[in-house]
Each structure stands twice: as structure tokens, then as C-alpha cells.
Amino acid sequence: MSLVAIGINHKTATVDLREKVAFSPDKIHDAMKSLASRTRSGEAVIVSTCNRTELYCNNGDEADIIEWLEEYHGLDHKDVAPCLYNYHGQTAVKHLMRVASGLDSLILGEPQILGQVKQAFAKAKEAGTVALTIDRLFQNTFSVAKKVRTETEIGAAAVSVAFAAVSMAKHIFSSLSTTKVLLIGAGETIELVAKHLKDNGVASMVVANRTLERAQGMCEEFGATAITLAQIPDYLPKADIVISSTASPLPILGKGMVEKALKQRRHQPMLLVDIAVPRDIEPEVADLDDAFLYTVDDLHSIIEQNMASRKEAAEQAELITEEQSYLFMDWVRSLESVDSIREYRNQSMAIKDELVERALNKLAQGGDTEQVLIELANRLTNKLIHAPTQALTAASRQGDLNTLGQLRTALGLDKN
């Protein structure tokens, strides 16, 4: 039994090459079936994201798997080979556990990768490319990733601008279940902010954007309300939290607009987070009572502190993945011993059945019972001791005292 992991990621290859070796969702089902057919066990899982493509196989030949990858995507070996990494056995197990725990991610400890690995495993099960070993490997991996999350602080501290903005909001309001949020912009960063807010159970969201259609498309996903930038003055007084990230060259929220909104709110506090460059919110807003303005620079200082915290947590997480990968390999070895015992018993039973059948035939033909039984005993003894005798002879001739000692112990020769 041999586990193999072969891959390419953001550390080893350019975006251009990563795009070429990626597997589209509509083709990955057939791709896993094709890859599995190149292994002796029929087991394979493909993890393909924007930052990595990795092939996990049981009882597969490394060179054959690499050849399959190159053939599938029509790529030259010289272009792909320098960017590939490969792991075997315990190191392959540990690598998968590190990946699922976010220890190998572009952003250390990011949680999205675990969901992506789970999705890849689910697709492999649908494709029928999962059996005992791969199933146990991935189930153990998910348990390890959960253990890393619960026993370390790897995911507790925000290390992305979007996550940091929402974390700050949670810190100030303690619970977001009763807060109303106004998001300004509809780009990737605001989309991530909306996702984090939804995950944290925010009461309601309004998305303001220059292009209403773009905002509406995003709002459908997150159950938010879409408005234009011109409508912001009408919605601002209702917002407990304002998070803005647009590409506007001029500020969108001025001191006067915010001051008016605060009066309508009867001076209930308002958190404003400006993560745009150049800034979307006039810095003078910070002078207003009840307005708490934070900029992207404030978030970056938080992120830097948190990254240091995550690195400390990562050291603990590495120990967990190391320990758990060895425990998994103990299970693999126990499985191999079970297979060996089963094969040995089946072989012995086959020898016994063959010789008993031969003896019964002789008795049926009128053979002497005593003679037939003696012949059966002799033949059975010779057959069963043939392989051990050869092994003892070979070890003696080679002067391999260690193997000789193990054989003597296994055969019970050293017992008093």
C-alpha cells in the first residue's frame, strides 16, 4: 500500500501554469475516474483550487501519475516537472493534513481550503474513486483540521482586510444579530465582507454601488438590498456599521453627510471602516462624536499583529499534523499486516485442501489408510515448512543475524 501526493501550488508555479493544470468543476468527475484507472487500487482524489492542484492516489506510480497529468492537459514535461512536488507515505498524509488545516495556504490558517478539500472528496465519492484507505485518510484529515482549529488559535485572528473589518465590528458590537450594515462598493473585497457578515448572522445589509446591476447581483447571494450611491443619504441614518471599498477618486461620504445622519440617529454610535485607497470617507469624520472611523492602515496594523499570533499557533498545529500522520500510518501498517495474515492463512488452507483431496481420492481407490495418512502428514509438513526453510537458509548464507533472529522468533524456535 503506497499513498502518493503530487501537486503544484502558489509557491511553486505562476498563475499561468496553475491555470493550465487546473480542473474545471464540470470535468473533474471524469478526470478522477481516469486518474483512478492508472492506480492499482482505483483510488484517487483531485483537489483543484485557484492556488493549487493536487492529486492524491493510493497504490499509484509517481511517474505514471505525472505522465497522466501532462497528457490530460496537453502539457510538456519540461514545463511542468520543475514546478511539481511529490510526497509518499507518511509525508503525503502529513501534507494533506497541513493543506486542510490551512498551514500550506497563501494566507496562513485560512478556513476556506478545508471546505474545498471536503468538496473534492465528495466529488471523488460520487465518481467512485474512494475505497477504504482514501476514505479513512480524508476522514482522519477532516478530524485533524477540526482539532487544529479547536486546540490552537490558528483561525482566531483576522489576517485579511475583509475579515479584519468584520472582526472589528464584532469586537465593538459584540453581536451582529441586531446590527444594520451599509456596504459601499460591490467589488471582491466588499463581497468577502458580505460573506463574513452573513456567516456572523448580521441583521440586515444594504449594498450601495455606482452600478445598480452589479450590486443587485451580489445582493441576491447574500439576501441584501441594493441601492445607488445617490441613495446613501437616505439609508445612512439606519446604519450601525458602514464599510466602504470603491475605486472612486473622491470621497463618497463627507463629514456633513455623516453628521446629519448621526443627528437623525439621535447620536447612537456608528462604526465606519474605510478600506479604500484612495479613501472613500473624509478623514474629518473621525472628529465627530459618536462616529468611530477606521482606515485600511488601522486594519493592516491589526493584521500584522494577528499574523504573528497565527505563526505561533501554526507551530502547535504542525506538531498535531505530525503526530496524527504517524498515527494514520500505524493504521495503514496494521491493515497491511491483516492482509498478510489473510494471504498466509489462505495459502495454507489451499495447500491443506489440495493434499486432503488427494488423500481422500487414494482412500476411495482402496489405498492403505495408515500409508495414506502418513503420506498426507509428510507432504503437508514439507509444503508448510518449505518457505520458512528457504528464508532461514538465505539469512544464514548472507550472515544476516537480525533477519535470522526474527525468523527464529516468528517460528517459535527460541521458546523454552
From Swiss-Prot:
Residues bound to substrate? T49, C50, N51, R52, S105, E110, P111, Q112, Q116
**Swiss-Prot/TrEMBL keywords:** NADP, Oxidoreductase, Porphyrin biosynthesis
Q: Give the E.C. number(s).
A: 1.2.1.70
The annotated pathway is: Porphyrin-containing compound metabolism; protoporphyrin-IX biosynthesis; 5-aminolevulinate from L-glutamyl-tRNA(Glu): step 1/2
Matching Pfam families: GlutR_dimer, GlutR_N, Shikimate_DH
Residues annotated as binding NADP(+): G185, A186, G187, E188, T189, I190
Gene3D superfamilies found in the cross-reference section: Glutamyl-tRNA reductase, N-terminal domain, NAD(P)-binding Rossmann-like Domain
Q: Reaction catalysed by this chain?
A: (S)-4-amino-5-oxopentanoate + tRNA(Glu) + NADP(+) = L-glutamyl-tRNA(Glu) + NADPH + H(+)
Catalytic residues (positions): C50
BP GO annotations: protoporphyrinogen IX biosynthetic process from glutamate
Top enzyme class: oxidoreductase
Q: Which GO terms describe its molecular function?
A: glutamyl-tRNA reductase activity; NADP binding
Record-linked SUPFAM superfamilies: Glutamyl tRNA-reductase catalytic, N-terminal domain, Glutamyl tRNA-reductase dimerization domain, NAD(P)-binding Rossmann-fold domains
Residues annotated as site: Important for activity: H95
Domain text from the record? Possesses an unusual extended V-shaped dimeric structure with each monomer consisting of three distinct domains arranged along a curved 'spinal' alpha-helix. The N-terminal catalytic domain specifically recognizes the glutamate moiety of the substrate. The second domain is the NADPH-binding domain, and the third C-terminal domain is responsible for dimerization.
Question: What other remark does the UniProt record contain for this protein?
Answer: During catalysis, the active site Cys acts as a nucleophile attacking the alpha-carbonyl group of tRNA-bound glutamate with the formation of a thioester intermediate between enzyme and glutamate, and the concomitant release of tRNA(Glu). The thioester intermediate is finally reduced by direct hydride transfer from NADPH, to form the product GSA.
Q: What family does the Swiss-Prot or TrEMBL record give for this protein?
A: Belongs to the glutamyl-tRNA reductase family.
Classification via HAMAP family: Glu_tRNA_reductase
UniProt function note: Catalyzes the NADPH-dependent reduction of glutamyl-tRNA(Glu) to glutamate 1-semialdehyde (GSA).
Q: How does it assemble?
A: Homodimer.
Q: What is this protein called?
A: Glutamyl-tRNA reductase
Organism, by scientific name, is: Shewanella sp. (strain W3-18-1)
**Which gene is annotated as encoding this protein in its UniProt record?**
hemA
